[in-house]
Amino acid sequence: TENAAAAQENFLDGSCGVWTGDMSAMVARLWGLRDEGMDLAIMPELLSKEPLGAATRDNDDDWNDVVAWVWYGMITAEEFGIDGSNYGDFVASENPGINRLLNSNLGLGTDANPLSDTWMQDVLGAVGNYYDAYDRSFCDGDGGMNNCLIDRAGTLNDLVANGGIQYAPPMR
């Protein structure tokens, strides 16, 4: 077909039996189609790997660092078992890694606009850790990774400790 829109149209009108595409785009479209009452599924087989991540403009290294470290912090929080509902229990931790995660700005931001020492607490309070955000974005959001449109367990989207490729450098 000519483009992704045409492929989708052919699939929906029955001209073809299978429709492939970028996983994140297919998930977004599947949500819309389910809202229209269609019972469709995304098959687990991947034809290609298309890593996606946050992007920032080229000329703002400070902003790029903040975006990257928010991601690393969300991963690190999950590794420590810290999430959007319990991070307050860890604020006074004597574990140096947890203390850096929750109580240090890591030198991020700019001289005129540095991050606060509690920036990661703000992130966790707003969106949670990586698990929380994934569950809310790709699953039913009940906290149990149920009814996921893109499975995480056993895939590259999981933490390194669980066989995936998601990891973060030390928070320093």
Question: What is each PLM-predicted segment?
Answer:
Residues 7, 40-44, 163:
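Residue-level marker of intrinsically disordered, low-complexity segments enriched
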Residues 1-3:
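Short beta-strand-to-loop elements that line the ligand-binding cleft
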Residues 5, 12-41:
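A ligand-binding cleft/hinge motif common to bilobed small-molecule-binding domains
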Residues 5, 9-13, 65-72:
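Solvent-exposed, polar/charged alpha-helical surfaces in well-ordered, non-transmembrane soluble domains
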Residues 107-172:
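C-terminal functional modules
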Residues 37, 50-53, 150:
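A near-ubiquitous, low-amplitude feature marking generic local secondary-structure context
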